């Protein structure tokens, strides 16, 4: 059956705040920085990477160029 081990990750308020703060300063992380954050927040590098990918997608949607909307 489907692998139940990995459900949707929920982040604590603290983790989210820290990730948002980091994103505010740079939308792309260096590997070194990702490792530091992973250690600081007790998350895996993979989780950090995915969070940033998702956050960038969200950011792009929010900052769409005003123009003809090609849906």
From Swiss-Prot:
Subcellular location per UniProt equals: Nucleus
- Name under which the protein is recorded: Homeobox protein Hox-A7
Q: Which Pfam families match?
A: Homeodomain
Task: Name the predominant localization.
Answer: nucleus
Q: Which organism is it from?
A: Ovis aries
Recorded family membership: Belongs to the Antp homeobox family.
The feature table lists the DNA-binding region at: 4-63
Residues in coiled coil: none
Q: Which SUPFAM superfamilies match?
A: Homeodomain-like
